């Protein structure tokens, strides 16, 4: 048992030590990420970015002066958006079915957080309600 715990601790330390966050300039971001920022967040001022070269997960984290954060994968595709201080996630980033559902059930609310991968979309509204949709935009889960 002690060997198992020691092995587990060594593995955990190795994984944490392998995280390699390094600062990057705006011009070092993937072209796709820069185009995304310029199209969907043109009024936001860039604060800093870092490249996370963790095992199995390479991504860019971009932070704006208002605190809004966007995570991009290594190809420059957005994965997570967390808006701050009155900023909102543009509805045009989502499938029509998600926009229609949210517009019908929460017409006065905006999306302030979004997370996506190949299988699902997650959104958080200004009123705190969170939804998970499948990749086709069908609702799968809701948390208020």
Residue ranges and their predicted role:
Residues 2-8:
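Sec-dependent signal peptide recognition
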Residues 10-18:
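Hydrophobic h-region of N-terminal signal peptides that target proteins for export
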């Amino acid at each position: 048992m002690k060997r198992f715990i020691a092995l587990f601790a060594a593995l955990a330390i190795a994984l944490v030590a392998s995280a390699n966050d390094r600062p990057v300039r705006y011009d070092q971001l993937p072209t796709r990420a820069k185009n995304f920022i310029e199209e969907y967040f043109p009024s936001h001022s860039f604060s800093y970015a870092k490249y996370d070269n963790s095992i199995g997960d390479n991504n860019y984290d971009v932070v704006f002066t208002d605190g809004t954060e966007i995570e991009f994968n290594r190809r420059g595709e957005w994965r997570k958006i967390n808006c701050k201080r009155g900023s909102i996630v543009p509805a045009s980033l989502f499938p029509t079915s998600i926009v229609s559902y949210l517009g019908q059930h929460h017409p006065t609310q905006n999306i302030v957080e979004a997370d996506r991968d190949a299988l699902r979309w997650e959104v958080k509204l200004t009123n705190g309600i969170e939804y998970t949709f499948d990749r086709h935009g069908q609702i799968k889960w809701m948390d208020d």
